[in-house]
UniProtKB/Swiss-Prot annotation:
Pfam families: Ribosomal_S17
Coiled coil: none
GO terms classed as biological process: translation
This protein's name: Small ribosomal subunit protein uS17
Organism superkingdom: Bacteria
Length: 88
């Protein structure tokens, strides 16, 4: 990965790749747990992020780390940092 990514101070998320059909683009599914202030129970928040994969090295099911970056297109504002676990 380029050095410019390592210096970026954006948010870092970990998620699972659910689509890699587009060229140099992946869609990452991120799930977070948030505690409800009144009910005191944990609620799952799920969101999809479109991320830039410059080397087309991800496949469906991989666990990846993405970082917030400058806008690359209308929907792409995230960049692939590392593949934490390859899919079987």
């Amino acid at each position: 990965m380029p050095q410019i990514i390592a210096k970026c101070n954006g948010r870092v998320l970990v998620g699972t790749v659910i689509s890699d059909k587009n060229d140099k683009t992946i869609i990452v599914h991120v799930e977070t747990l948030v505690k409800h202030p009144l009910l005191k129970k944990f609620i799952r928040h799920r969101k999809k992020f479109t991320a830039h994969d410059p080397l087309n090295e991800c496949s469906i099911g991989d666990t990846v780390k993405i970082i917030e970056f400058r806008p690359l297109s209308r929907n792409k504002r995230w960049h692939l940092v590392a593949i934490l676990e390859k899919a079987v």
